[in-house]
From Swiss-Prot:
GO molecular function: hydrolase activity
Protein name: Head-to-tail adapter protein gp4
Keyword Hydrolase: yes
Superkingdom classification of source: Viruses
Compartments it resides in: Virion
UniProt keyword Hydrolase present: yes
InterPro entries reported in the protein's UniProt record: Gp4_sf, Tail_accessory_Gp4
Cellular compartments per GO CC: virus tail
Disulfide bridge positions per record: none
GO-annotated biological processes: symbiont entry into host cell via disruption of host cell envelope; symbiont entry into host cell via disruption of host cell wall peptidoglycan; symbiont genome ejection through host cell envelope, short tail mechanism
Function statement: Tail protein that binds the portal ring and functions as a head completion protein. 12 copies of gp4 form a structural ring at the bottom of the portal ring. Together with gp10 and gp26, gp4 is required for stabilization of the condensed DNA within the capsid; perhaps by plugging the hole through which the DNA enters. Plays a role in ejection of the bacteriophage DNA into the host cell at the initiation of infection. Functions as an exolysin that catalyzes the cleavage of the glycosidic bonds between N-acetylmuramic acid and N-acetylglucosamine residues in peptidoglycans.
Organism, scientific name: Salmonella phage P22
Subunit annotation: Monomer; homododecamer upon binding to the portal ring. Interacts (via C-terminus) with the portal protein; this interaction participates in the head completion. Interacts with the Tail hub protein gp10. Interacts with the tail needle protein gp26.
Length: 166
């Protein structure tokens, strides 16, 4: 099953809950589908937090057009499972169901993995601070009279080191 649209994410979540699937030939009412798509949009907005939260690549609907089930979701393939498992946990009470322990565990693990991926992508390579000595074993640095690591470099290499000391 290819999960390309927001409606596909909702159907996958409902399939995990056992509410609707192609195997049982049960379908979801259009209003229930729209409610679930709205829940998906709200959940992804909570996760995203204006760029400070989890980055999944989700494409939000614009203010003029409400989210529709045919809209592309834009998620990275590594985020799809975590999203529809968490959506299943979120919409289960709407159908008077309780998500199984496996769905809850998979949702939790998937969201933690997305947090880790986002944190790793945001982390920058931190150089040694300029107060850190190079050490006596670093013979090349000692030959050049470099006794400390250079630390962060100036963004503009033409800026003199003594700028502003005058």
């Amino acid at each position: 099953m290819q999960i390309k649209t927001k409606g596909d994410l909702v159907r996958a979540a409902l399939r995990k809950l056992g509410v609707a699937s192609d195997a049982t030939l049960t379908d979801v009412e259009p209003q229930s589908m729209q409610d679930a798509v709205d829940d998906l949009e709200a959940m992804m907005a909570e996760w995203y937090q204006d760029g400070k939260g989890i980055i999944t690549g989700y494409v939000f609907s614009d203010d003029e057009n409400p989210p529709a089930e045919g809209d592309d979701h834009g998620l990275r393939s590594s985020a799809v499972s975590a999203v529809f498992h968490n959506l299943a946990c979120r919409i289960a009470p709407d159908y008077a169901l309780e998500a199984t322990a496996k769905i809850i565990a998979t949702a939790k693990y998937g969201k933690e993995l997305l947090y880790k991926q986002t944190a790793i992508s945001r982390a920058k390579r931190a150089p040694y601070p300029s107060r850190m000595p190079t050490g006596s074993g670093n013979s090349f640095a000692n030959l050049n009279e470099w006794h400390y690591f250079p630390g962060e470099q100036n963004a503009d290499s033409t800026t003199p080191h003594d700028e502003g000391n005058g």
